[in-house]
UniProtKB/Swiss-Prot annotation:
Modified residues (ADP-ribosylcysteine): C172
Gene Ontology BP, a term: glutamine metabolic process
GO cellular component terms given for this protein: endoplasmic reticulum; mitochondrion
Name the record gives this protein: Glutamate dehydrogenase 1, mitochondrial
Gene this protein is translated from: GLUD1
Modified residues (N6-malonyllysine): K457, K503, K527
Region: Disordered, residue numbers: 34-58
Binding of substrate, residues: K147, K171, S438
Keywords of the record: Acetylation, ADP-ribosylation, ATP-binding, Endoplasmic reticulum, GTP-binding, Hydroxylation, Mitochondrion, NAD, NADP, Nucleotide-binding, Oxidoreductase, Phosphoprotein, Transit peptide
Enzyme Commission number: 1.4.1.3
Amino acid sequence: MYRCLGEALLLSRAGPAALGSAAADSAALLGRTRGQPATAPQPGLAPPARRHYSEAAADREDDPNFFKMVEGFFDRGASIVEDKLVEDLKTRESEEQKRNRVRGILRIIKPCNHVLSLSFPIRRDDGSWEVIEGYRAQHSQHRTPCKGGIRYSTDVSVDEVKALASLMTYKCAVVDVPFGGAKAGVKINPKNYTDNELEKITRRFTMELAKKGFIGPGIDVPAPDMSTGEREMSWIADTYASTIGHYDINAHACVTGKPISQGGIHGRISATGRGVFHGIENFINEASYMSILGMTPGFGDKTFVVQGFGNVGLHSMRYLHRFGAKCVGVGESDGSIWNPDGIDPKELEDFKLQHGTILGFPKAKIYEGSILEADCDILIPAASEKQLTKSNAPRVKAKIIAEGANGPTTPEADKIFLERNIMVIPDLYLNAGGVTVSYFEWLKNLNHVSYGRLTFKYERDSNYHLLMSVQESLERKFGKHGGTIPIVPTAEFQDRISGASEKDIVHSGLAYTMERSARQIMRTAMKYNLGLDLRTAAYVNAIEKVFKVYNEAGVTFT
């Protein structure tokens, strides 16, 4: 199935013309025919044209079904990697048996395994009763526990939670976090409920998940998402620990994104936005990719626009601003603002906290039109899914699209961006900072000790002993005739001498994770000649890892 699709896709799409005019190192990285193993060029032969996967899909809607959209991206990756998976199987089976095995496991990976649909009543503060709807989808249990956020939104649907759960599976695989994918949603507008009512909804939803076996430190671990945060996660942890987890010493590991006092971890609030920054950093500093885009490496002369000024948008903006990029526009659901001279994230954050909106910010003007189409180098869609579509993709002016949100780009828009030589840094890599630091928090809860507590003093003393040893060695060699020879550490080293704090360890671990994963995606793109199609490279990377788990573990009762 996947091979047939892949063969069809290999027929009729030529790579972007811009690739042929790139620098030599860029051409070596990105200029070959996409999707085929690297071979020496043959004089006089042009690369075979190829179709993009969205052209092969039956669904050509500008607003596709979200889960079908993710499945389409998966199919594209599967069609690219199937032959390699068959080739790498080290068994005595025939070629046909190997291919059947590979296709069978790919069919296991693709669908969403479990979807729990709930409805429960609450009594509101005015005495009226209301029935609340909620969902929890578990896409894959190839690794346990499952992991994924809980969002509160009137747009929540079965299709949405299935799509987001599947993205979580691939996201965890891309950054080597050993979780399966899951997602939950409660169909409410939290602005219409009091804090007391939201606590009732959250605690009751937790109990419903617990009764059905959809929450637990080793089963399924929720996290914050749209319109939820530390407060809601604290309610969930307390509800679970006070009921079904009463005798479980690891009960507070049932959820991540908690306050520090409830077992949370330093750096979790900003983790997704910081991950977005590190993801962009890894690609924007790669000279070969920047030469393809006609840009210079680094943040120094870059402008960017953020759509969505929530947790992800704010922290992405803060870190890019801190490293020299200039934010020229910010968009929200009620309007957008623009200032070509730059917008300060702290000033805008303070204004929004005071007024509840970014509109009216004195150091920017109202932007007429779609902020997604504003003139900038980097566009960060950090709001909701399916924001970049076939309709607006031709008008996007950014050279880099950094997907801070889940699923902001439809398949048709993705095709257009590839044709226009626009680099899309995909969601399943770029916004994985949240689940990465959630993994660190989960490990902290299981270990029952904060990061660095056992080593703070030892590391500090070791550093001072090292400096003293160097000083004494120099004095023995050159003598003390001119006095002692003090060893003065630099400011950066002085900050580290006292030992790494938990936040330092978390930030370092996140930066390393994003860097390593970016390199894996780049190598995969080169290996399969995918050019600027980083999304397919990320999906291929994820599929290879999930496939390996299923293949080596074996399939029970088949």
